[in-house]
Amino acid sequence: MLMGKQSELNAAEFPTFLYDQGDRIGLLKRILKALGSPDQKFKIIHICGTNGKGSTAMMITAILKQMGHRVGLFTSPYIGEIYNGIQIDFKNIPSRIFEEKISVIKKLLRTAAFANVKVSEFEAQFLISMLYFAEQRVDYVVLECGLGGELDATNAVATTMYSIFTKISLDHVGILGNNITEIATTKSKIIRHHNVTITAQNQSLEALKVLENEAVSKQAVFLNADRVTITTSQQSKRSKQVHYRALLGHSEQSGTFRFDLAGTYQLENLATVLTWFFDFVKRTSFQQRLDDILAHSLAELVVPGRFETVQQKPKIILDGGHNPDGISAFVETVQKLYPNAPKLIVNGFLKDKSYEIAVQKLLTLKNSSFIITQPENQQRELSPVKLADVYKKYTNRQFPEFTSPVKAIKQAIMTASPTTVILVVGSFYLLNPIRTYLLSRSEHNGN
């Protein structure tokens, strides 16, 4: 899912969507082999799930970097330019190298062995990342699934050290499956023989059963983040101390460190990350003080688009909640942090999401008004007129509508009172233009 600058991957050469066009994984395995098997030059931590993948990936990357490793990070979706989706130690792939790798892939696809073959833009981005990470000799790659699972481009890698599953819920219904069991079954196929498989805490019983059975069939070690307990103590509005206790087999780890990521859901993601971290430390005989590593890597980590504060006056927060579970987590966080503040919510969804359920959840937020807009995705955007009709159905109110996300946020800023919290929530295709506008505006104003 490419969401930033698009010109580098011409749509005619790299179609948007080929997910259901034949044996995509078999094709990508052949391409990787022809490219010299770059995916086998480093150890892979593969992350799959419905919500929380990006945050989990960034936390793990930050920890590995703090431990002294050279770390590749592949994320989808991402915020900003196309290069943001491929990073080493949190630095984007240079545009020149990106273009070089595109040329390598194009040249290969022109050979007789791959005559008349096309790869999608997401598949191309994945292949570029593998070439780049191998060339730059990274130690580890944190690899985030796209749609996720059996037919996801990232599943073409030969082997992985870890398969990590964040919360699995209903999303991409009809593509991944029609219920939790079917979706979890599709996602479980990233598990590799003899690797370590980790599941998020509070995973549904249906998903948990599927993941555990697949891990057993692959003779993988299976770890559940339910064995990590986290409590917090607030130091300030923005900062908190995390107190954790992890039961690992017959041993126990406990400690405290600063953790500033907002969002109650980030504590669930953190439990998953801690489960991985303590297993990883055990397997690599790491000797440094663990709480120091956690504090230095996670204390000031920012995850773009995940309850991210991008402006203080007025306060503007961006969150990529775009399915029922994501919206529930967003609502819970807003109610906890801003229970009484006036709230102005800029909202837009893709038409293939369960947007009516999401609207009903958003309407539970007290002291809220709404501005309706649409994501920047011509194929999948839900028109603001249709979304406004859903709001009207449940409130009998007509909220302002804008086809342009940037015009929507401008209107929000213009009408907000000094105490209003502006919350932008919905598709990452909505957040991307708004975030770009706000950051460029901030730079222009010298903030």
Name every feature range the model reports, one short phrase each.
Residues 112, 136-144, 160-256, 270, ...:
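Acidic, Mg2+-coordinating active-site environments of NTP-dependent enzymes
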Residues 202-223, 315-316, 324, 359-421:
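C-terminal helical cap/extension that packs against the catalytic core
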Residues 140-143, 151-164, 168-172, 182, ...:
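Nucleotide phosphate-binding/pyrophosphate-handling subdomain across enzymes
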Residues 60-65, 133, 391, 438:
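Hydrophobic alpha-helical packing residues
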Residues 427:
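Active-site-proximal loop/hinge segments that shape catalytic or ion-binding/gating pockets
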Residues 32, 37-40, 66-158, 176:
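ATP-dependent carboxylate-amine ligase catalytic core
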Residues 74, 200-202, 214-236, 259-264, ...:
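Beta-strand->loop->alpha-helix junctions that form or flank phosphate-binding loops
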